[in-house]
Curated annotation (Swiss-Prot):
Annotated compartments: Nucleus
Enzyme class name: hydrolase
Single GO cellular component term: Slx1-Slx4 complex
HAMAP family tied to this protein: Endonuc_su_Slx1
Keywords: DNA damage, DNA recombination, DNA repair, Endonuclease, Hydrolase, Metal-binding, Nuclease, Nucleus, Zinc, Zinc-finger
One GO term (biological process): double-strand break repair via homologous recombination
EC number assigned by the record: 3.1.-.-
Name of protein: Structure-specific endonuclease subunit slx1
PANTHER family: STRUCTURE-SPECIFIC ENDONUCLEASE SUBUNIT SLX1 (PTHR20208:SF10)
Amino acid sequence: MISTAPADLPSPKPIPAFYCCYLLRSVKKPSSLYIGSTPDPARRLEQHNGFTKGGAKRTERDTLRPWEMITIIEGFTSRTGALQFEWSWQHVHTTRHIGAVETDQLNRRRKDPPVDQGSGIWTSTPKVLGNLHQLLRSTYFGTWPLTVRFLSTEAHSHWQRWTERADGLLPDTIHVELDFHAEGASVLDSNLPANDMTHINATYSGIQDHLEKSASLLNDSAKTLACEVCKKLLSPHGDVIVVCSQPHCHAVSHVKCLSQLFLRDEGSSGLVPTLGDCPACKREVTWVALMKELSMRLHGAKIATKLLKKERKSKAISDSRKSSKSGKKTANTYADILGNDYDDLDEDWMNSVNVDSGSEPLDHKFTNANNSTGRVEIVIEDSEEETFD
């Protein structure tokens, strides 16, 4: 029997679909920078630029708008982790993580006087990116599977120059991605930056097929399942099971068995692996991908049920469109269906997931979510100490 948390403790939550820290830069005044975090960068940028309600007081000034996102750090597996990183990035002069790395070109003390009492620190894009480089090399954050996505060629150039003179290299867990396809001015409004972040998928659509496959495998009572590592029989109602994320692989394993295998192959003494080769298909899978599907299956039954319903509905729509020869656009496209479900998910969206924490056997089945909630307007609020003027 798998033990469960006491009833008075919060229920476990699924890993967020997406959470990132970001660096904003004022288009009108490029020396003005802002550090924040969000589960939805497209909507957050709209808020900062005043198109929707929310944002932060320090980005409301017309003398600084519009803002553009020039760098995002993605891959956080919880809101708490993203907020920890955000705070450390904002307060490099006091965070305990920087001091464990080096005391080279970046000085942890504030040498530049603030512009005024409410404007923060005088700084620059190179310095902020240098602080980021140090954080990613720290003992604490350096073990996280994060991706630094550059949306500005200028920001990436600053990063490269810093990398060349830094004392150390980024750990293998940190990846750098270039995303320059939307630089320049918007075709709709020349006063706005082209990169509105709408091309970034911040929804769970990426794990729908994985969830569908897991549901099919684990809910088939006629199918005998065995761990790919230890070869022992698996019980969908008693074992914590991970399912390979590769599309055509049906490998299942004990989470502990696969974790130990990946750690051994990595030669790591850590507790949580980063990635590894599936023992069945021999293709590389990331541990985060496996845990995101597992956490949704175990702790996000309502959302998982909605995802599977929309996956099946979208496939039906796709089949209908293929069979139609009219060439007309079908109403409620896949993007429309998915967008309607995720538009109101925010920093606090996980609080709406109601998962029983009783002492019942573990069940990998998804129950129907009968209780629907009305749409409400959600305003993102964040700290007031992350603007650098």
